[in-house]
Amino acid sequence: MDKIGKDRNDKYDNGEEMQMKITAGLGSIDEYERFVHAGADEFFCGYVPNEWTKKYGTVMPLNRREVLSYNVQIGSLGELEILAAMVKEYGKPVHLTFNALYYIPEQYPEIAEMIKKCMRIGFDSYIIADPALILYLRKQHIDCEIHLSGETAEVNTGMVDIFQQMKLKRVIFHRKNTIEDMKSVITHVQRQNVGDTEGKRDVRPLQSRLEFEAFALNELCQFTGAFCNSLHCDEMGYLCRVPYLLTCIKNGQQRNDYITCGKTTSDRDDIPGQETPSIEIPAEDDTGYLPGVSGCGLCALYRLKEAGITHLKLVGRGNYTDFMEKDIRNLRRALDILKASKTEKDYINSMKKILFPYGCSGNCYYRQHYYRSKK
C-alpha cells in the first residue's frame, strides 16, 4: 500500500487506527435497535410512501424494491419520524435509498419535495443511482448528503471526477468492480486531494473527505444492477432468481443436452465430454443459517482495507431478521479478526477457522482475488 493510502485511510486525525464501518440494510424500523446492538455502524433503507405506490404502482419504481408483502422498506412518514427518534437516541445514521436508474420528468419535483420532508425530520443522507436526480437536487440547492449508488454501474476515475463536481459524500462501488479497480479510483482521488507527491497527508477534516463503500455480504447477483430491467415486486419472481446452468456451448450440441428449468443436477443428462462436478455443501447451523450463502466477500476484507475502502455494505433488506443479525455479528467478528491479524494469510486462516469451521458457501464476491490468493 502506498504512503498516501496509508496516511489517508488507516489513521484518524488523532492517530488512532481507522476501521472500516458496517453499513447494514434495514427492512423495517423494528430491526433498528437489534441491529445496533449486533454491531452495525450505520444503515440504509428504502422509503416508498403509500401515495407514490398508489399513483405509480410497481412499473415506475422509486427505489427498485417495490415489495409490500414483507419488510423491505418504510411506507409512511410517520414510520420515518419514529426511526428519526431512534437514530437520535442511538447515534447510528440511516441513509435513504432512491435506487431507480431513471425517472420521468414529472417525478423529479415530487422526489425533491419528498427529500425536503425527510430532511426536516432529520434524514440528511441519500443513496441515489440516477445522475439526473443528483444534478436536479443540486440545481434546486438541496444540500443533502449524496452517496452514489452501487446501481450506477461503471466506476472509474473519469466518472468520479465528474460526480465530485456535484459534491458527493460517498462512492459505492458496484458488485462487479474488482479490488484493483477500487484501489485505482481511490488512489486517484487521494492524489488529487494531496498532490502527486507520495507521503503528503490529507489534512482536511474527515467529514469533508470522499468515502468509499464496497459490497461485503449477501445478494451477489450475476447481473450488473445498472443493466437490470427486472421488476422487484410481489407480482412476479425476480429475473435473477430464475434457475439456469452456466456452461460452455459447443457447435452442434443438441438442445436436449442442456439443463432445463425445474430439473436438478442429479437428474439431468451429462453434457457430452464433461464430467458432472461434485459440489460439497457446507454445514449450516440448526436454523439453516450460513454466513454469506448468497454472496460473501469476507476473505477480501484485508485487501479492501488496503485499497482504501471506508465502509462495507451488508445487503439484506427483506431477509430474515435473525439471519441479518447474525450477519452483522459475523462481519463485526471478521473485522475484529482483521484488526488483530498481521498478514492477509493470518487473517483468512483465523477468520475461516472461526466463522466457517465446516466450509464456506464458495459464493465469492471477489472471486478473482480469491483464486489468486489460493495459488
Label the model's feature ranges.
Residues 6-18:
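Short, Lys/Arg-enriched N-terminal segments with co-localized hydrophobic residues
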Residues 15-154, 180-313, 317-375:
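Active-site pocket-lining/capping segments in soluble small-molecule metabolic enzymes
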Residues 157-158:
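Conserved nucleotide-cofactor-binding alpha/beta core module
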Residues 167-174, 235-240:
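A polyampholytic, Gly/Pro-enriched intrinsically disordered region
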